[in-house]
Amino acid sequence: MKLKEIDRTAMQAWSPAQNHPIYLATGTSAQQLDATFSTNASLEIFELDLSDPSLDMKSCATFSSSHRYHKLIWGPHKMDSKGDVSGVLIAGGENGNIILYDPSKIIAGDKEVVIAQKDKHTGPVRALDVNIFQTNLVASGANESEIYIWDLNNFATPMTPGAKTQPPEDISCIAWNRQVQHILASASPSGRATVWDLRKNEPIIKVSDHSNRMHCSGLAWHPDVATQMVLASEDDRLPVVQMWDLRFASSPLRVLENHARGILAIAWSMADPELLLSCGKDAKILCSNPNTGEVLYELPTNTQWCFDIQWCPRNPAVLSAASFDGRIRVYSIMGGSIDGLRQKQVDKLSSSFGNLDPFGTGQPLPPLQIPQQTSQHSIVLPLKKPPKWIRRPVGASFSFGGKLVTFENVTGQPQQGAEQPRRQPVFISQVVTEKDFLSRSEQLQHVVQSQGFISYCQKKIDASQTDFEKNVWSFLKVNFEEDSRGKYLELLGYRREDLGEKIALALNRVDGSDVALKDSDRVAQSDGEESPAEEGQLLGERIKEEKQECDFLPSAGGGTFNISVSGDIDGLITRALLTGNFESAVDLCLHDNRMADAIILAIAGGQELLAQTQKKYFAKSQSKITRLITAVVMKNWKEIVESCDLKNWREALAAVLTYAKPDEFSALCDLLGARLESEGDSLLRTQACLCYICAGNVERLVACWTKAQDGSNPLSLQDLIEKVVILRKAVQLTQALDTNTVGALLAEKMSQYANLLAAQGSIAAALAFLPDNTNQPDIVQLRDRLCRAQGRSVPGQESSRSSYEGQPLPKGGPGPLAGHPQVSRVQSQQYYPQVRIAPTVTTWSDRTPTALPSHPPAACPSDTQGGNPPPPGFIMHGNVVPNSPAPLPTSPGHMHSQPPPYPQPQPYQPAQQYSLGTGGSAVYRPQQPVAPPASKRYPNAPYVSPVASYSGQPHMYTAQPASSPTSSSAPLPPPPSSGASFQHGGPGAPPSSSAYALPPGTTGTPPAASELPASQRTGPQNGWNDPPALNRVPKKKKLPENFMPPVPITSPIMNPGGDPQPQGLQQQPSASGPRSSHASFPQPHLAGGQPFHGIQQPLAQTGMPPSFSKPNTEGAPGAPIGNTIQHVQALPTEKITKKPIPDEHLILKTTFEDLIQRCLSSATDPQTKRKLDDASKRLECLYDKLRDQTLSPTIISGLHSIARSIETRNYSEGLTVHTHIVSTSNFSETSAFMPVLKVVLSQASKLGV
């Protein structure tokens, strides 16, 4: 699909891949003339803007040259890391000269753009190429077999790759190898190609076609394979592209015969080796797969030949072609629609003519219509197959913070037998699309930090493009200056100096500056308020200054006067004054329309009378400024704001600025702004922003600005945020208000702004601008994402934890062990027989296992009645027993010098329910070492402290204190008849030699077979001391939370008959209550035959030999077991909950199991069925690895391929894939399941299922 077009007969060169934006340089082509027959030459640079739908390319610069060019390339030499316009333009001239240009100077308009030039060659320079490994090396070819290697760092003297080839001939094309930096190839029109080794300074191989009709017009190396190259022929008798492999240089590896006439140029894509461009004399531009010869794409061109074609280095889907009709066209191989382009051309043509009447018909021209028959050709199809850069496994995804995560299929040979799979790189890039937006945001942040608000506002005033923008920033600037109200008045056009001059002229005075100065001082000192005394003083000063000749009160020595008491108005006034009736006197004066006398008498009558008189005066007065005087005198500023004509909004705002009190100033400005918004036209609506700035109302300013301005682009939002931030700072400094409170609209805009900053990678700035005191879900979510992106915790939120970390422990209870981790996961509820075992790994500590009787022990001590509540996040299973008897608090005793007689309480342990077993003596043979948690019916049952070892031996946890013996009212069971312990082991461990005996009368239900381990479900059981069967390579796993250290196999040997009951505790009375029924329950034993010390163990065991203090964990062959396993029953194993297989790999298990079942249903041979049963069991190892996700991606991919072959019943293909996996992967990864899988595939193939 054609994207752009340039009307030039020129050679072309794309800017390097590092350069952004993309440029295309053109130089006037030699030996060609355009339609104007101009002999001038030029070098131009165009910018590729794919966002512009037009065909035109923007010309960035033009340089008039005295040379015409046969070849033009743009090398990345001295390219800076920022990707600015740089590099070197290298041109091959028609007179044997090579010229180096600086493209950055050409774009800048500099006249000195030539870096260097040499005319070393004989004849025109038709071949040029830059070494991609050493970009300072340039190869050039010309006539007489001349090949030179130029060093751009030392351009004076070139090098030669070796002696000239004989006979001398022209060099039509030259190319550096794409994999080996010292290999160079050249070709001539005679059809011969020569490969040079610069280390040896000689040709190493020559390639030529035996037909002697091969005229080379193009040469290109394979982008990935160092020994392969293609040659193009321009001979019409042999219009082919030959692909050669230098390892088999006797004949071409492949020949592409897709052109009907000679080929003029070729270009091999560096991004996809399966894309080879070629253009020929048949006016076709083809994109072919050189490996298969298939034509993947044919570009829609005209009937003109193309003599040069090139891929864009930065955008691999874009290419350019220069044709003999004087045009350079830019195409895309990804296809698209040309409807928009056609419509744009039609609109352009219509706009040129408009609706004029060029033919004098008196009728306007109808709109130009697009021919309907061309609509079916409006869609240009892309390549037949996706190119490599968008082909799997390649992908890209944007993540939060403007990050672009990409991955690609990196070529490389897998290492045989390597322990680690080959790593595939994932690239994380920061995408910045709004550079101006980021720059202005950073400037705003700097201003806020440096407090340089006045200078910032002044810069904005100077840079303002409109008067309104200038006024807004002027009003914002005034907030940070002294006498802000006076400055506001000046901005509204009311300068006091100008007013004083006008008043002086009106009073025939010469200088009015004194009047203005005194007015200014009066307003500044009063701050909008005037007392009657101040008014009188001002009036007296005015009278004195004007030096009035008349006196209101003549002195007594001025003569006598007559006091009239006649019946007229004057007499009545006189009588009222003589009797002190000022109200009547004032009414008479008003009745006689003597307003001045009424006001003067009202002043003498007091403030109340004066106010009544003023109202009556204003009611009768009908002058133009009566309402203004009324508002000023009555201090009714709201009247001015609500009733004035909106055309006089400046005057109303000036009155408010002059007279309003500070507590009502903001409200009046808001009221005026609201009137301008609701009642005014579009021009007046924008002026409301000035009122809101004076009021300091940020929320109203945001609403008004949003209505008046277009906020659809980031820079418009930046304009608003700048004003909002500056105004908030001004309000914070001048009005001392809480600016942290934001409204819904402002919060939305700040959230949008923070989102934009985050999208550009400015996470810290986005978090700084995000409002803090809002609970809007979008803002809370954004704040959480920003904090997580910075690796910080969310303010005001604590991470949810189910462990006890940071929670205070109940008094009397032990804390966690020092130096041992605490597990934060609460155990899942499972079912076991009713024997309570203290887990070794809990939510508090890692401890030695301790077996407890089934009845509940006493609750943990607490200083408060009812016990301490469980910490937050703790999950309580079952019902709480509130009336558990509490023993005395424990206290620290001797540090491991003797075993503790009673368990140390562990409060708030999650309890779980056990089921009782019946009949038979089931043997406990766990595959994994587990221990059940406490009983569900006693959720407050404390954990038991670890039992110390024998005297004289160190405890395994030296940080664990032992408690002193205390009395307890809890019932005590009798001694056991035999030692009871757990037998621990790995997979296939031998069973325990002893188990717990159930109390008489206890009934229950045995666990289901599905809940038992495999060792209890299938096959005969081994003896207790047989060696374990190693069925797979063991690997070290993380200990589970309920892990219990092993009880040594010597337990029944060292203590075959059990321990006698201590005499000191036999006579203790049992407590009343339901627990007395458990008195006959046997006492469990600990490791090494040691009985449980928590309830019935004596205070010390001094007679134990030292050799028994450290249990022996190795079994004694042939040791007698006696009657130790009679009348006892062991605990069933814990049902181990396995992680689910990931959904994407669940198909593997389904497919394999289904295949085994099909084979079992078809098999008749018992031996075959045994193999399949064994395979079904051994494939569990594969499923475990899938759950743990420990298999390499290569093996996973191969297993899915095998599953697909099973679905299609192509077992031979599955066996082939199986062989490939085994031969290319690590043996230790596949040895456990791949042989079994091969057996299943072989049996399926044999049975034909």
Curated annotation (Swiss-Prot):
It holds the Pfam family TPR_Sec16. Residues 796-805, 1013-1024 have a biased composition (Polar residues). Ubiquitously expressed. The ALG-2-binding site motif-2 (ABS-2) contains a PXPGF sequence that binds hydrophobic pocket 3 of PDCD6. The modification Phosphoserine is found at residues 526, 531, 799, 1192. Keywords: Cytoplasm, Cytoplasmic vesicle, Endoplasmic reticulum, ER-Golgi transport, Isopeptide bond, Membrane, Methylation, Phosphoprotein, Protein transport, Repeat, Transport, Ubl conjugation, WD repeat. This is Protein transport protein Sec31A. It is found in: Cytoplasm; Cytoplasmic vesicle, COPII-coated vesicle membrane; Endoplasmic reticulum membrane. WD repeats lie at residues 4-47, 64-111, 120-160, 166-206, 209-254, 258-298, 301-342, 397-429. The gene is Sec31a. GO terms for molecular function: calcium-dependent protein binding; structural molecule activity. Belongs to the WD repeat SEC31 family. One of its GO terms (biological process) is endoplasmic reticulum organization. A motif (ALG-2-binding site motif-2 (ABS-2),) lies at residues 873-879. The lineage of its organism: Eukaryota, Metazoa, Chordata, Craniata, Vertebrata. Residues 161-470 are annotated as: Interaction with SEC13.
